[in-house]
Amino acid sequence: YDVFDTVTQVIAYCESEEEFNTQMDALHADLITYNQLYDIYNDYPGVTNVKTINDNAGSAPVEVDDRILSMLELADQMYQTTNGKLNIAMGSVLNIWHNYREAAEAAETDADNKLPTMEELEAAAQHCDINNVIIDADAKTVYLADPEMLLDVGSVGKGYAVEMVCQAAEARGLT
């Protein structure tokens, strides 16, 4: 669970245990890199990530790594393909659910658990317009025009990261 808060299982064929361990170390390092880039909760020294974009919502464009730009461009395509059902701009709503879940996990008893109100969710939903995610591929920047908007790249980030990590592993000779 040290990357993307999920289990990663790899089945690979190598000539030796040493080669396998070397390949797995490289693959794990790649996953850690993508996890840090797509993280919405944590800062990392020297890393501009999705949290950095969220922290600058409504303030300024953020210069980002190509791996963030490519993933966000895929997310926009997925938004179009799914008629808006897959929306990385839903972060303000998902953040409310996250906060309530965290509070429930910390609660002494289930009696202390609460659900968000419809008013909270509806207010947050006003800040989920993907058109307010301004990507400038030439400048390599991302700007959230709505200061209350938050990105949550969730499934798109994980899926894209796994695809890129697998391509890199294959290029290193892993089968």
Predicted stretch roles:
Residues K158:
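Short, conserved phosphate/pyrophosphate- and ester-handling motifs at nucleotide-, phospho-/glycolipid
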